Amino acid sequence: GLGTNILGYSNDFVDRAVQKTLNNGNLSTLNCPEEVYLAEKLIKIHPWAQMVHFARSGGEANAIAIRIARAAINKNKVAVCGYHGWHDWYLSANLNNRNSLDTHLYPNLKYKGVPNDLKNSIYTFNYNDIDKLSEIITKDKQVGIIKMEVERDQKPNKGFLKKVRKLADDNGIILIFDECTSGFRETFGGLHLKYNVVPDIAMF
């Protein structure tokens, strides 16, 4: 994942643990005990969460979160802010306007191969622009998900994240925080704990 190496590269402790695990076998179709142990630890850190799902990359984790949220809310449209990988659900924002994602970390993201049926399923808003987010939600009642990073290259304006949470609550919308990059760098448990704003789904 982009920027997820919070322990750096070639960390001796991590390398030894990985090598030991590989020696025990590198392919299993069942959950290993370590997965259960880690899931329990994560839920202890985040008592608002009830379940944990593991993924192999940030992009995959984002795609899984979107699918879970869509199934739960039975609405397909997403208001999105920030960078969330290269899967179809995200890149389809550029079907609406080829520049929709340009202000979200990476400009000129290519959407060739993304089904045209996904057009107008993703709406973008810029960080700290609560008015634009409110406008998106007001205009299209099929928006059932707000998907965003807690913070990247700028701090939230005073009350911004709490306003996002309230917008989600008032409109029956699922709020997803992508903390794949922020991770546990600044706060043990993620940046949402620092700002005291609890999402419905978070990923690290």
Summary of predicted features, one role per range:
Residues Y37-G144:
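PLP-dependent aspartate aminotransferase-fold enzymes
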Residues L2-P33, Y37-R56:
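Glycine-rich phosphate-binding segment of PLP-dependent enzymes
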Residues N97, K112-P115, Y123-F204:
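Conserved PLP-enzyme active-site core in the AAT-like
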Residues G3-N5, S10, E60, N76, ...:
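Gly/Ser/Thr-rich beta-alpha loop segments that engage phosphate groups in nucleotides
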